[in-house]
Amino acid sequence: MGEISITKLLVVAALVVLLFGTKKLRTLGGDLGAAIKGFKKAMNDDDAAAKKSAEDTVPAEKLSHKE
């Protein structure tokens, strides 16, 4: 009873297509894809900025202990 079968998935998919229509689903898919692409680009830009910032830092001067 609690199992998800292929027939149940097909019925749900058919209902979604009937409710929203193919054009709306296509638009929604495109918007979702663009959002994921933008998120990945922002993550890569942030990583590149952090790496550049780490490369720009001056290493600390090593001090020797004098007795």
UniProtKB/Swiss-Prot annotation:
- Indicate whether DNA damage appears among the record's keywords: no
The entry's localization annotation reads:
Cell inner membrane
Q: Which family does it belong to?
A: Belongs to the TatA/E family. TatE subfamily.
Record protein name field: Probable Sec-independent protein translocase protein TatE
Protein's UniProt keywords contain Kinase: no
Q: Name one Pfam family in it.
A: TatA_B_E
The record gives the membrane topology as: Single-pass membrane protein
Report the gene name: tatE
Which keywords does UniProt give here?
Cell inner membrane, Cell membrane, Membrane, Protein transport, Translocation, Transmembrane, Transmembrane helix, Transport
Q: What is the lineage of its organism?
A: Bacteria, Pseudomonadati, Pseudomonadota, Gammaproteobacteria, Enterobacterales
Signal peptide span: none
Q: What is this protein's function?
A: Part of the twin-arginine translocation (Tat) system that transports large folded proteins containing a characteristic twin-arginine motif in their signal peptide across membranes. TatE shares overlapping functions with TatA.
Q: What biological-process GO terms show up in the record?
A: protein transport by the Tat complex
Top-rank taxon, per record: Bacteria
Q: Mind telling me which residue stretches traverse the membrane in this protein?
A: 4-21
What's in the GO CC field? TAT protein transport complex
Q: Give GO MF terms, alphabetically.
A: protein transmembrane transporter activity
